[in-house]
Amino acid sequence: VSVPFPEPTEHVSTRTEVYLRYLAYFRDGVGRRVEAMTEDEARRSRVPSGWTPRELVRHLTFMERRWFVWGFEGTPVDDPHGDEVDGRWVVPDEVGTADVLAAWRRQAEVTEAVVRRHDLDEVGRPSERWDGEPPATLERVLLHVVQEYARHLGQLDVVAELGGGVTGEV
């Protein structure tokens, strides 16, 4: 069952719920597209920059860790940029796409727990994530992550369409 698009007129009790619903919608789109691919399709790049769908999912996993755990909560994490080598997304060959998706889903649960523990106006803790800048509020972090998901889902739509897979609002 797919997550419905959160309509602007839909009654939602809090701003936090609005952000979490949009995030769930975009996550659902990413998951359904990659789950519909064969292992070979998920490992295949169809774009000049060379990324694969499974690399995109792993990037999203690490991106959420960087913003919510390492950044906002200020909790040290092992290898916060473990999704990249020389600026390019990577997944070790021996790691299957199902494992990449499972790690992404676990991180989504962590992210939701972080968001629910804090108020949107709360400012993150100082950490290396902020690169010397003052930490952002949780709302700004959420907005950034929602837009990153929307952008990457659009990119994944193109890749899925080129491979004859699931696209659009389905």
Predicted features along the sequence, with ranges:
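Active-site rim elements
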Residues: 13-19, 97-101
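Acidic/histidine-rich alpha-helical segments that form the ligand environment
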Residues: 87-126, 139-145
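Short, contiguous alpha-helical
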Residues: 2-9, 16-87, 127-170
